[in-house]
Amino acid sequence: IYFLAGRYEFRDKGIDIYIKALGKLNEKLKQEKSRKTIIAFIWVPANFRNIKTQILENKTLFQDIKEALEEVMGDVEKNMIYSFVSNKKIAKEILFEDNFLTEMKIRVARFVRKGNPPVATHDLYDENDTILREIYESNLKNGEDDPVKIIYYPIYLSGADGLLNLNYYEAMQGSHLGIFPSYYEPWGYTPLEAGALGVASVTTDLAGFGRYFCTECSQSETPGIYVLKRLNKSHDDVVQQLVEVMFTYS
């Protein structure tokens, strides 16, 4: 799980670099025939209308499946124990009653959707939102064969948003790599916060913290904090640096 979090400053926060690099990482993982899946979050608040109806419906249907399974777990446990002590092969027909399996098929059929999952969790007022446009231009579609799945989450992580229901630090702790490829940042605490929580991160030599942490130093192959070289480097060069970091870390 990778993430970028911060204010909606598309260029200064390096959101453009992050999305472009994810698009190239997606293609690189395909070429390598990698079996890995990267979930890439963009936790950047924007002017949203509401949570997408499709997501709310699927959340309700998933909860229905979960609760139906929880109701029969006592019987499932008994059936599993019986199968073990009887040295019988465990099969779903032994674990579950026929009527439960039939009902579950109906529930799953309602849950399964055609097409690709949406790249944003909310409907936005601006149909030409810069982040959304960059996602589409980078060919990030959340297709079944795409190793990189992107989730644009345009709401503050309050811990009670109706979806993740995690606060900022909880969401960060549940991730593996925080990416902050800033073009300008007087200091920038986010890589430091990630490190304090035991999460690896990426910063740049144009951010105050990145310059303090490592300007001329030679980094190891897998440092806890990666420092991209953005000073006097082209946009494409920085994108490629980030692609290599994300690919190595995956």
Which residue ranges define each predicted feature?
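A broad, structural surface signal
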Residues: 16-27, 170-173, 192, 240, ...
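Beta-sheet entry/capping signal
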Residues: 1-2, 16, 37-41, 149-150, ...
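A structural signal for short secondary-structure junctions
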Residues: 34-35, 144, 172-173, 195, ...
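Catalytic binding pocket for nucleotide-activated donors in carbohydrate/polymer assembly enzymes
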Residues: 181-250
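Short, well-ordered loop/turn and helix-capping segments at boundaries between secondary-structure elements
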Residues: 11, 24-31, 46-49, 177, ...
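Acidic donor-binding loop of glycosyltransferase active sites
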Residues: 169-186
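Glycine-rich loops and low-complexity Gly/Arg-rich segments
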Residues: 26-30, 64-69, 175-178, 203-206, ...
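Conserved catalytic-core segment of nucleotide-activated headgroup transferases in glycan assembly
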Residues: 1-169
